[in-house]
Amino acid sequence: MTTRIDIRFAQLKREGRPAFVTFVMAGDPDLATSLQLLKALPTAGADIIEIGMPFTDPMADGPAIQAAGLRALHGGTTLHKTLELVGDFRKDDATTPVVLMGYYNPIYIYGVDAFLADAKAAGVDGLIIVDLPPEEDAELCLPAMKAGLNFIRLATPTTDEKRLPAVLANTSGFVYYVSITGITGSASADSVAVGDAVARIKRHTDLPVCVGFGIRTPEGARAIAAQADGAVVGSALIDALQKTLDTDNRATQATVGAVADLVASLAAGVRGAQQAAE
């Protein structure tokens, strides 16, 4: 199968530049603002969009993304409404890849077959499910692949040579390398260590490797993108959004623009990695 993710990475390879991947939480702080933000991301420079599925117990997420998920849940965002959000985004954008990221529990409750059918129909291209290891591939990974969705696996600094082949076995779309040990937003990525890790992963796979966790500035994005096939930014965008909210955590006129401006500056940093390599 060829997905929008595959097409986008092939395009980026022809252009000789890394991908800029943005993460936002579905329904944060409300569904209408969330849709406006999604529509603004590609124009600002996002090559791939990851959309968080709000969940009550997000164990891998730091304070910023946890708070975003709670705002979304309090605003009434459900997994069904998250898929509707993707469908609404697709009415105006048929090309930007969309990856849903989150935890297995809401999908299990929704029903795997129903979720995969509805996700595919909405225009979802891939899934990142952080609490499903390769040993559980039969639960969701293999059915997702059969449904035509990429299943993107996480590799970490603690994923050793013995474990890596299992992690990569049924991965498609790209590999998401978590550059730090710990929760999101908790530290800065070390570009030298990242370069070594990406090289190690690439000895085992031809898939693109994108690096996330710990990227907050254009300079940081540029340094990481120079070592990988893409850079992922989430917590910094969530922080920028949160700073524009009113005292009741409602969106203001500044909300979408503030995030889009940061995306544009980070995207320029990622594109600077291409120029530095030339």
Swiss-Prot record:
Domain of life: Bacteria
Pfam families documented for this protein: Trp_syntA
Keyword terms of this UniProt record: Amino-acid biosynthesis, Aromatic amino acid biosynthesis, Lyase, Tryptophan biosynthesis
InterPro entries hit by this protein: Aldolase_TIM, RibuloseP-bd_barrel, Trp_synthase_alpha_AS, Trp_synthase_suA
MF terms in GO: tryptophan synthase activity
Catalysed reactions, as listed in the record: (1S,2R)-1-C-(indol-3-yl)glycerol 3-phosphate + L-serine = D-glyceraldehyde 3-phosphate + L-tryptophan + H2O
A single GO cellular-component term on record: cytosol
TM helices/strands, residue ranges: none
The UniProt record lists the keyword Lyase: yes
Pathway: Amino-acid biosynthesis; L-tryptophan biosynthesis; L-tryptophan from chorismate: step 5/5
EC number: 4.2.1.20
UniProt keyword DNA repair, yes or no: no
Active-site feature positions: E50, D61
HAMAP family according to UniProt: Trp_synth_alpha (MF_00131)
Biological role stated in the UniProt entry: The alpha subunit is responsible for the aldol cleavage of indoleglycerol phosphate to indole and glyceraldehyde 3-phosphate.
Complex and partners: Tetramer of two alpha and two beta chains.
Family from the record: Belongs to the TrpA family.
Stated name of the protein: Tryptophan synthase alpha chain
Source species: Rhodopseudomonas palustris (strain HaA2)
Gene name of this polypeptide: trpA
